[in-house]
Amino acid sequence: MPKGKKAKGKKVAPAPSVAKKHEVKKVVNPLFEKRPKNFGIGQDIQPKRDLTRFVKWPRYVRLQRHGSILYKRLKVPPAINQFNQALDRQTATQLFKLAHKYRPETKQEKKRRLLARAEQKAAGKGDVPTKRPPVVRAGVNTVTSLVESKKAQLVVIAHDVDPIELVLFLPALCRKMGVPYCIVKGKARLGRLVHRKTCTSVCFTQTNPEDRAALAKLVEAIKTNYNDRYEEIRRHWGGNIMGPKSTARIAKLEKAKGKELATKLG
């Protein structure tokens, strides 16, 4: 083969004109000019973004958020931390189902009852005083006096009472007096039970004979979860959970310390 000449390979036949795709050119209207936006400072109006983080929330919302964060960050003593251990859903459902039977009467029901009694008296049938039906007793003062007099059969405390100091002493008092107690979610649910907005605590004092077995079963389960575990609960601190920034900073420092130690040891 002579010097300077390159070997030529076989040429591939060009594709037929039918197989070639004809690209249609996009018709651009010259009247429409491109005006790209500049989102720099002091330039175009910014696009809509999620600015939830920068919203100035109402004061009560800010306080709620600060409170919840502080509960996580600070070391929470066992007396307060025990209110995070609410009753399990299944037992709580059974408890509220039973408590629903012993709801106190509303103002309208009381009015109707007294009106019927007054009509009966006016008709000359005589006034026969009716026996007070067994109902759940509500309110921290009422519950406290019933526990102290050992008339309470079961005490139910809300987990989110604010200020918590209102019910802080109740678990210790119940244990001292040998009364079964439990902590449930939340004060609004207890409030609905007794026809109020919120309620700190309720207690059972009397029940009908047909419900005594159900109450005894509940009391047994609740005693196992709360009264019998008191020593364990009083040793368990809460909180002390750092945020992502603090955790990252601590991890960075630990890594630097480890590196320094490794270089020293060689």
From Swiss-Prot:
Residues 1-11 have a biased composition (Basic residues). GO terms for molecular function: RNA binding. One of its GO terms (biological process) is ribosome biogenesis. It comes from the Eukaryota. Gene3D superfamilies: 3.30.1330.30. GO terms for cellular component: cytoplasm; ribonucleoprotein complex; ribosome. It is found in: Cytoplasm. InterPro entries: eL8/uL1-like, Ribosomal_eL30-like_sf, Ribosomal_eL8-like_CS, Ribosomal_eL8/eL30/eS12/Gad45, Ribosomal_eL8/Nhp2, Ribosomal_eL8_euk. Pfam families: Ribosomal_L7Ae. Residues 1-21 are annotated as: Disordered. Keywords: Cytoplasm, Ribonucleoprotein, Ribosomal protein. Belongs to the eukaryotic ribosomal protein eL8 family. PANTHER family: RIBOSOMAL PROTEIN L7AE FAMILY MEMBER (PTHR23105). Component of the large ribosomal subunit. The ribosome is a large ribonucleoprotein complex responsible for the synthesis of proteins in the cell. Component of the large ribosomal subunit. This is Large ribosomal subunit protein eL8. It comes from Ictalurus punctatus. The lineage of its organism: Eukaryota, Metazoa, Chordata, Craniata, Vertebrata.
